[in-house]
Swiss-Prot record:
CDD domains: cinA. Gene3D superfamilies: 3.30.70.2860, CinA-like (3.90.950.20), MoaB/Mog-like domain (3.40.980.10). Belongs to the CinA family. Transmembrane segments: none annotated. It comes from the Bacteria. Pfam families: CinA, CinA_KH, MoCF_biosynth. This is CinA-like protein. The lineage of its organism: Bacteria, Bacillati, Actinomycetota, Actinomycetes, Acidothermales. PANTHER family: NICOTINAMIDE-NUCLEOTIDE AMIDOHYDROLASE PNCC, NMN AMIDOHYDROLASE-LIKE PROTEIN YFAY. It comes from Acidothermus cellulolyticus (strain ATCC 43068 / DSM 8971 / 11B). InterPro entries: CinA, CinA-like_C, CinA_C, CinA_KH, Competence-induced_CinA, MoaB/Mog-like_dom_sf, MoaB/Mog_dom.
Length: 427
């Protein structure tokens, strides 16, 4: 079964709102075994909405549209559906009664006349009740395709999809169309390095066509999605398990988790299991490492606290760095990172100390180019240091540095080498 997703709203085209609905629908449809072949975004214009929806119905079996079902004058999905199908809009008395009852239940004596727009539907369209809001969805057949028009509010869209759309699509798909996915999460390696390590496996899977691999990179992390389609969930899971085992061998200790795991939660769990604590001394990252370590509930059990030693004076006064060291080596230096980490560890009585220093830009510092980053982790057994050279703007460099710091702490907790060990492609 082929599907397309159409997001409606000028605010999406202008970038005022991120199109999270499309991402959620893509995943939800894939889990139902529905192949999403195209996605589109169209502004608030009846003719253009009708044109985009019409083109989608000629290609796909199912079209899921979001947005444009509210009460205001720029909510035009109902009108566009009517124009596309060549039918009139009709006022649905049951929808109107439900809208009035909902407002009365909220203690609203005055029912805004504009809200009656939400009671209109194209002739032949079936309303989809909205238990999470006011605007109902619509189900409408156009040609050989079915259009599901859903509200743009994410919570309302998801509720209607789960209650009304997903069951119908699952029934239409029938057996033999289960699609499962598993995501392996790597850190500290480039997307190209991950792809190179998996090149032989990827080439083999490309010949088979099922399962498949896909790569998604962001901020120093690369996700590897393994997807398999089979007659039932057990068969699909078995296919994924085989590929996952081989992928983990190839990717080695660069894999830190799977599916919804986050590096913050993984580090928190490792600290908890070890009965260990951590403290942070940050320059380059300005408190972002501490923020990441407190992201997980129960962080106070493992995180002692931190210092943002952003200036030379702060490094000397709050962390006890020797002015002579800074004068000799500058603040962007691996030895400075080690002293910062050990100082905060000692001062706060933590098992581990983590420190960051570097150049986020826009200009060079201490003769070091933008993107130079040093991260240190100290403990009873001595220091571990990574020096990396990152690219991107100031914000991106800082976010990548946070991931490197968290990964270096993870590696220290697991007694792993400071840098990932990947298996390279066979020559």
């Amino acid at each position: 079964m082929k599907a397309e997703v159409v997001a409606i709203g000028t605010e999406l085209l202008l970038g005022d709102i991120v199109n999270g609905n499309a991402a959620w629908l893509g995943q939800a449809l894939a889990e139902l075994g529905v192949d999403v072949e195209q996605m589109a975004v169209v502004g608030d214009n009846v003719a253009r909405i009708a044109e985009v929806l019409g083109a989608a119905t000629r290609r796909a079996d199912v079209v899921v549209a979001t947005g444009g079902l509210g009460p205001t004058q720029d909510d035009l999905t109902r009108e566009a559906l009517a124009e596309l199908a060549g039918v009139p809009l009709e006022r649905d008395p049951e929808i109107e009664a439900a809208l009035r009852a909902r407002y009365a239940a909220l203690g609203r004596a005055d029912f805004p006349p504009m809200n009656l727009r939400m009671a209109d539907r194209p002739h032949g369209a079936v309303p989809l009740p909205n238990p999470a809001g006011t605007a109902p969805g619509l189900r409408m057949t156009v040609g050989n395709a079915v259009i599901f028009a859903l509200p743009g509010v994410p919570g309302e869209m998801r509720e209607i999809f789960r209650r009304w759309v997903a069951p119908e699509l699952a029934e239409r798909a029938g057996p033999g169309t289960v699609l499962l996915s598993r995501v392996l999460r790597t850190i500290g390696v480039w997307e190209s390095e991950v792809a190179d390590a998996l090149a032989d496996l990827d080439a083999e899977l490309a010949l088979r066509g099922n399962p498949t691999l896909a790569y998604l990179a962001s901020e120093g992390q690369t996700r590897v999605r393994i997807s398999a389609k089979a007659a039932n969930r057990d068969l699909a899971a078995a296919m994924i398990a085989e590929v996952e085992e081989r992928a983990r061998i190839a990717l080695g200790d660069a894999v830190y988790g799977a599916d919804s795991d986050t590096i913050e939660a993984v580090v928190h769990r490792l600290l908890t299991d070890a009965g260990a604590t951590v403290a942070t001394a940050e320059s380059l990252t300005g408190g972002l490492v501490g923020a990441a370590l407190t992201e997980t509930p129960g962080a106070s059990d493992v995180y002692r606290g931190g210092v943002i030693g952003y200036t030379v004076a702060a490094k000397v006064e709050l962390l006890g760095l020797a002015p002579e060291l800074i004068a000799a080596r500058g603040v962007v230096d691996p030895e400075v990172a080690v002293v910062m980490a050990e100082s905060i560890r000692s001062r706060l009585g933590a098992t581990y100390g983590v420190a960051t220093t570097g150049v986020a830009g826009p200009a060079r510092q201490d003769g070091k180019p933008v993107g130079t980053v040093y991260v240190a982790v100290t403990a009873e057994g001595g220091p571990t240091v990574r020096d990396v050279h990152l690219s991107g703007d100031r914000q991106r460099i800082r976010r990548q540095a946070v991931n490197i710091a968290l990964d270096l702490l993870r590696r220290r907790l697991l007694n792993l080498p400071p840098e990932p060990q990947l298996r390279r492609r066979r020559s």
